[in-house]
Amino acid sequence: VTPEDLLGRDPVAPISTLMEKNTTGKVVMISGAGGSIGSELCRQILYLNPRSLVLFETSEYALYRIEAELKDLAQRTCIPVEIVPILGSVQHPKRLKAAIAAYEVQTIYHAAAYKHVPLVEENVIEGIRNNVFGTLEIATAAKRQGVESFILISTDKAVRPTNVMGATKRIAELVCQALASEPSDTVFSMVRFGNVLGSSGSVIQLFRSEIESGGPLTVTHRDVTRYFMTIPEAAQLVIQAGAMAKGGDVFVLDMGQPVKIMDLAISMVRLHGLQPYFVDGAAHSQGAKEPPRTDGDSGELEQGDIPICVTGLRKGEKLYEELLVGNNPAPTQHPRIMTASETSLTMVQLMPVLERLLAACKAQDIQTIRRIFNDLPLEYSPSNPHLADLIWNKSPQTVLAAPQLVK
């Protein structure tokens, strides 16, 4: 079963001139180069004949794997591209500045982020440091070094966020919007998309693993829906949207209709040549080896090979997701890419709030972090009313060292 089998719509075709504008013959850096989206960006950009590909990644193993894959791909396709593997964190400004300057980077795709909703919900401070201040560091370094184009990979979870991950990505957008409002040689833009089929930790990987182990498939709610795209589609959207940017743009993809996760689970089971049936989710969550079968409130799926159970929404999880803030999407030259009209702040307005946020992270002051989320134009409406960091829960008086804010 491939992700394309489950998409439920035609993939979005790329426009070659947009794909080439910021990549062909350019020095391109990808942060988070070893991740699901970052690695696909690397593959797509390699085929577009960049001068150099600078892979910036904090995970040694992920960097090793993507470097080896790209070098093999370049050799097999006879593409003369320099591939530069750099270990580093986006939270380290000196390392970022040195890498950008040394290789005279022209385009940056910022894909490095903590993205898993439940993990970030319980590791609030590190989520903020990486997603907010990591973005501030790399975006500021790009501006100072005269990078031509900076594209932030964002998410539909940044729209009226109900979880910490979404809130941090919306603040990252505010950072890029604020930098775009100032005189600069760098064109800043943001690209939002929904869930990526087959990416690290995606529902497809989860369901495939659950099917292989005999089930049950775990669905958090019968009515939960998500927008989806394939990994190549997501990478192509990022590349093309960045090429259309004028500065401060928020791009979104027309992803068709949202997909019901329950329907996705049923389809995956059937595409494996099996039949699904429902079991009691409460009994499963209590550790029952053989939870009782149910009719799924539909009178159907009482008999089958693979069980499906409903486990309840996770911390910070939305039932439905939106791709746009407001009701004024504007078209672009790509028929399936639009721009969203978003509230923004200047750096003069934003920096004092970020200073407060950094101080709250250093002090592990979760309550102040919550207030700052409410003060910023995020439309933050947490589904989890008890925001708490796992370490803060155990030692609320402990103060951790944090990187200094860019001045």
Predicted features by range, described:
Residues V1-V27, K143:
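Flexible, Lys/Arg-rich cytosolic regulatory linkers and terminal tails that connect or flank
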Residues A13, T17-N22, L174, A178-N195, ...:
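Strand-loop microenvironment adjacent to phosphate/nucleotide-handling motifs in alpha/beta enzyme folds
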Residues V28-L46:
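N-terminal Rossmann NAD(P)H-binding glycine-rich loop of SDR-like oxidoreductase domains
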Residues P50-R51, I100, E104-Y109, V147:
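Proline-aspartate-enriched helix->loop->beta-strand connector
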Residues P50-R65:
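Conserved glycine-rich Rossmann-like NAD(P)H-binding loop of the short-chain dehydrogenase/reductase
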Residues V84-T107, G316:
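Conserved Rossmann-fold cofactor-binding substructure of NAD(P)-dependent oxidoreductases
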Residues P85, G127, F188-V191:
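Hydrophobic/aromatic anchor residues within beta-strands of the central parallel beta-sheet
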Residues H110, Y114-V117, E121-E173, A178-L179:
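Conserved Rossmann-fold NAD(P)-dependent oxidoreductase catalytic core, especially the SDR/UDP-sugar
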